[in-house]
């Protein structure tokens, strides 16, 4: 949905106040006067659903709807955003309140999943005495996706985050993502879906610290301005942080400021590796292995999944157990959730990156033994099982197959529990006159005792 604003009136201000719920266009040729923008932002701030504490899109979409591009990339990216808190526009952020990340979405090939690819990297060097056996194995150095750096020159730092009198901020990246010398070779592709996210902290009116990760998905037009992505098929959202918070209450990682999985995936992708362990920190692989930690440690060809994190702290997940059946993929992934349009990829686009986190591909494991002959036929004689491509995996495990992910993860107990109905007819408290014998009597009936039917592919 694109907004073209030529004049300002009451109706226009109302439409901008609601813009936090929708998208906007790019390349506006007639900017709105600053006074009009401030009025529009103030009106938007008065709408409770636009509060930045709960609406991750409004900081960008309201501005985009008012004719101010959320993102401009003509050299170092410039990000325009507003912060709405307690019905007002917030104007007291400092550079220490924000960190920015930027990534592009690269479509998968040969059956591989689409992946976010960050534009900014740092190099981690393995530390002597850290890692498996305390040795520098399996890698001495590794690249890790990261956030944009702060300027070191005081003058440039002062100009990196600017509050505009019209009621919004402009952040200028230190990294010029159009210069491959600054992006570890990652090429800027304006036509691809991009994402900018903020690690944002601020105080609300009650004095409480708010930690949020607003983000926006967009492409870049010929003028270098953002065009918001409104087609769910043109992004990648596999899981919603609300699913995580169902168990974790409030997800908060890396010091507590990274609270949304849509932000996590911008760094946790195939471009990030832990130098001390050699583990690739792609979010799908890492999170699945963490939740399956106990099973991996006790399975055939077992694995003690360990990551060396902040200040080389060792984090072993061998004692971590998912609080229910590991086959229940829909706890975290569901295409029926509007917030996760790619939530059904676990069953429609099976991949080694996800599946082999639970199905251990170590030498001697059941998976390795069962698939080595297949690899020898489809790849090359003597090829390891993990040499099979995702496209080859889909030949056997695609939708409709008896070996599809949905079929083999079907859980009869879970399905029956959802259908089981028990009616409590009455509850009575029983007591004696001297209170020496007390009891509670519950009468109940079970009108339905369904038998679950497995998927039709069985």
Where are these regions (language model features)?
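Sec-dependent bacterial lipoprotein signal peptides
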Residues: 1-19
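A structural signal for beta-strand and strand-to-loop patches characteristic of beta-rich domains
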Residues: 362-370, 398-424
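Disulfide-rich extracellular modules and peptides
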Residues: 23, 246-249, 266-269, 331-334, ...
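Short Fe-S-cluster ligation motifs
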Residues: 270-311, 355-395, 424-437
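Low-complexity, acidic Ser/Thr/Pro/Gly-rich terminal tails and inter-domain linkers that flank the onset
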Residues: 43-71, 409-435
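Extracellular low-complexity, Gly/Ser/Thr-rich intrinsically disordered linkers
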Residues: 321-372, 395, 401
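Bacterial Sec-dependent N-terminal signal peptides
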Residues: 14-50, 386-390, 394, 398-412
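Extended surface/linker regions that mediate inter-domain or inter-protein docking
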Residues: 59, 72-348, 435-458
């Amino acid at each position: 949905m694109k907004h073209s604003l030529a004049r300002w009136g009451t109706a226009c201000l109302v439409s901008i106040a609601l813009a936090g719920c929708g998208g906007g266009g790019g390349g506006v040729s007639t900017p709105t006067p600053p006074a009009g923008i401030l009025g529009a932002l103030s009106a938007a701030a008065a709408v409770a659903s636009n509060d930045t504490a709960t609406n991750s899109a409004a900081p960008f979409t309201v501005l985009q709807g008012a004719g101010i591009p959320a993102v401009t990339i003509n050299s170092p990216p410039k990000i325009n955003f507003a912060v709405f808190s307690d019905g007002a526009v917030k104007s007291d952020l400092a550079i220490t309140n924000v960190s920015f990340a930027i990534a592009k979405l690269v479509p998968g090939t040969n059956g591989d999943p689409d992946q976010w690819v960050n534009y900014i990297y740092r190099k981690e060097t393995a530390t002597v005495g850290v890692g498996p056996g305390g040795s520098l194995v399996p890698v001495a150095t590794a690249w890790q996706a990261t956030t944009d750096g702060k300027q070191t020159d005081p003058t440039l730092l002062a100009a990196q985050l600017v509050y505009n009198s019209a009621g919004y901020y402009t952040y200028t990246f230190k990294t010029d993502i159009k210069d491959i010398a600054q992006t570890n070779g990652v090429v800027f592709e304006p036509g691809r879906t991009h994402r900018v996210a903020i690690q944002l902290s601020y105080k609300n009116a009650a004095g409480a610290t708010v930690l949020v990760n607003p983000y926006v998905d967009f492409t870049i037009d010929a003028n270098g301005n953002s065009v918001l992505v409104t087609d769910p098929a043109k992004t990648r959202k596999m899981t919603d942080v609300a699913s995580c918070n169902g168990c974790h209450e409030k997800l908060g990682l890396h010091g507590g400021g990274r609270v949304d999985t849509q932000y996590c995936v911008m760094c946790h992708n195939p471009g990030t590796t832990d130098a001390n362990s050699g583990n690739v920190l792609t979010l799908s692989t890492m999170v699945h292995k963490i939740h399956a930690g106990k099973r991996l440690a006790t399975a055939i060809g077992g694995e003690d999944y360990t990551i060396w994190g902040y200040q080389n702290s060792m984090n072993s997940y061998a004692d971590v157990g998912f609080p229910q059946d590991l086959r229940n993929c829909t706890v975290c992934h569901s295409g029926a959730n509007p917030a996760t349009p790619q939530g059904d990829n676990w069953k429609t686009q099976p991949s080694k990156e996800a599946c082999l986190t639970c199905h251990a591909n170590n030498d001697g494991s059941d998976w390795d033994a069962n698939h080595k002959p297949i690899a020898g036929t489809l790849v090359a004689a003597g090829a390891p099982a993990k040499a099979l491509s995702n496209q080859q995996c889909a030949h056997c495990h695609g939708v409709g197959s008896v070996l599809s992910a949905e079929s083999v993860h079907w859980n009869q107990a879970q399905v029956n529990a959802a259908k089981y109905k028990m009616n409590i007819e009455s509850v009575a408290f029983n007591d004696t006159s001297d209170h020496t014998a007390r009891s509670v009597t519950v009468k109940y009936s079970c009108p339905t005792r369904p038998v679950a039917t497995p998927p039709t592919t069985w």
